[in-house]
Amino acid sequence: MVETSSLSQNEIDAMMKRIHSVPIIETLQMEILRLDEGECEGHVPRAKKWDGIYQTFHGGLLATIADTVTCWAILTKIGSEAKVATTDFNIRFLRPCNTDVRCVARVIKAG
């Protein structure tokens, strides 16, 4: 069950339909925990198959998770059927990731 405080059930259903149409969601076993206007929270379980060379979560996959959850946060503002693309992305890793991933995206400025 997806938590929300600002979206209608119809909006949640439309978002979840769009989310589950993207193959990376199933591939990474990503679960969407919360959708609110301009916000999304996702979870990806830790699995050895996602490791990089140091037996920690591969940085490229962490970036993919962040990019994906950010997309869903944006779509809560502009509509689940809107066409979007990442044009610029920057991430700084603070330490290795040896656990499940919880990712929270919040739209600061739309447009």
Residue ranges and their predicted role:
Residues 1-111:
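Terminal targeting signals and extreme-terminal segments of soluble enzymes
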